[in-house]
Amino acid sequence: MEFIEKVQNDNKAVSEIIKGWGSDIIVTRGKCYRAEDLDGILVYDNGKIIGLGLYRIKRDCEIVLLETFVQNKGIGTQIIEKIKEIAKSKNCKRIWLITTNANINALGFYQKRGFHISNIYKNAMEKSRKIKPEIPRMENGIEIRDEIEFEMEM
């Protein structure tokens, strides 16, 4: 496995992954992001992307997307550690992210890695669906309704 910082040449491959989810935009807290506008960490194995973390730094570090295609190998944890190193080097005071109430794997994953719930935005997904109608309504048999903000102080 190789962890590398995303460069311009990676944008097409990353955009194709995101388009596979129905659209080439990522919506969080009512804001739209495009992969090519975000910094990131890519994980390659035998020339294939098996994980990625996209983030933006604006005083604090926001993890906009974290995805691994091979589970239970520590890839997501290692991506977070790489992003934490970058955030520290940029003097960020915290790392934060948004997930949904129905993403039960993420809810446990982030708490096990030291993140704390800092906000719950009730019914926020309705606003996000106005921007990106492709967002599903259900996940894990749970209505996708609320956005949950996690943070970690640096």
Question: Model segments located where?
Answer:
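Short hydrophobic clusters on alpha-helical segments that form packing/core surfaces
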Residues: 83-87, 106
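Conserved GNAT acetyl-CoA-binding A-motif
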Residues: 87-99
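Acetyl-CoA-dependent GNAT
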Residues: 5-71, 77-80
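Conserved active-site tyrosine of GNAT-family acetyltransferases
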Residues: 110, 115
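Conserved acyl-donor/pantetheine-binding loop and adjacent beta-alpha core of acyl/acetyltransferases
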Residues: 25-35, 46, 52-54, 119-147
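Conserved beta-strand-loop-alpha-helix junction that forms the acyl-donor binding cleft
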Residues: 97-106, 122-129
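Conserved N-terminal entry element of GNAT/NAT acetyltransferase domains
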Residues: 1-9, 148, 153-154
